[in-house]
Amino acid sequence: MKNTQLLLINDMCGYGKVALSAMLPVLSHMGYRIHNLPTALVSDTLNYPKFYIHDTTEYVRQSLAIWEELGFEFDAISTGFIVTEEETRIISDFCHRRAQKGTKVFVDPIMGDNGKLYAGVPESTIGLMRHLLECADYAVPNYTEACLLTDRPIAEQITPDEGRALVDAVRELGAKSV
């Protein structure tokens, strides 16, 4: 494990123990060699009535280009909250290239909860996340995200069989494990 190189692609939240601020210390303590690529600087979690998101798309583009030029390798990539359509395309293309080389790709398609997309997340994100899932070894959508990705209606309750069918539908998008 000490030589396992993990690239975490997610937002950095100023107020709240989520995303990179939660992942970095835990995975570092576990002995992984952690590298991070912040997709945004976020003032607080999106469930508050007011927040600010600082877009880092250009930073992401430049960093990935430099890292590829320098030959940096990763054993696994984990994606989380991605802010813009352009950033999603850049990260998806990078993950597809790396997956072809054997890098494991973990996708948390963070885009909504409680039956709707998060504030500021456009509908077009759904299609872009579907493309990212095509190269995913592991996908961890919540119920809302799984329904949005598979064009299924969001229900108050589902049966175990409906839950399994939803997982299978996400798997049909390309994710090897859900």
Task: For each feature predicted by the language model, list its residue ranges.
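Conserved phosphate/ATP/ADP-binding segment of small-molecule kinases
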Residues: 120-178
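Conserved N-terminal subdomain of the carbohydrate kinase-like
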Residues: 2-107, 111-119
